[in-house]
């Protein structure tokens, strides 16, 4: 994992979230609504995440890119909710909770966001939070990511 320096969130995401908050409709399905009904905003979100992360998956650092910009050597970016929507619906459109990750599957083996699923990674800090120190992350030969002891 690398430290991710978050920049300003895309305008479309901010406006959509503020609209949901003001009319009381913010829920875990708000993200899907944003993705499905606001393609321009969703593309802006993907591009912003890709730029901040230098085109790398937030977990394994594999090269990623938004679907429309993907080259043959890159994985398609998936928007990852670091804190899962199932438990933290109020964070589903919070930019600091959104990261870019790879599709997370090699054959039948799941990794990264696909392996994480709806679990909370309490022991692994959000790489976009202040004070994140990449040196505390250890990578095992089997691909496991854990805290350096």
Residue spans for each PLM region:
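Short, cysteine/histidine-rich loop/knuckle motifs that typically chelate Zn2+
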Residues: 59-60
């Amino acid at each position: 994992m690398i430290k991710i320096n978050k920049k300003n969130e895309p305008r479309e995401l901010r406006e959509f979230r503020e609209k949901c908050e003001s009319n009381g409709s913010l829920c875990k399905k708000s993200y899907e609504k944003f993705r499905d009904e606001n393609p321009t905003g969703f593309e802006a979100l993907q591009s912003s995440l890709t730029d901040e992360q230098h085109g790398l998956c937030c977990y394994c650092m594999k090269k990623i890119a938004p679907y429309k910009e993907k080259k043959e050597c890159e994985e398609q970016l998936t928007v990852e909710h670091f804190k899962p929507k199932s438990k933290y619906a109020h964070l589903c459109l919070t930019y600091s909770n959104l990261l870019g990750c790879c599709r997370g599957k090699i054959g039948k083996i799941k990794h990264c966001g696909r392996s994480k699923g709806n679990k909370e990674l309490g022991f692994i800090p959000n790489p976009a939070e202040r004070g994140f120190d990449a040196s505390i992350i250890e990578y095992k030969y089997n691909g496991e990511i854990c805290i350096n002891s």
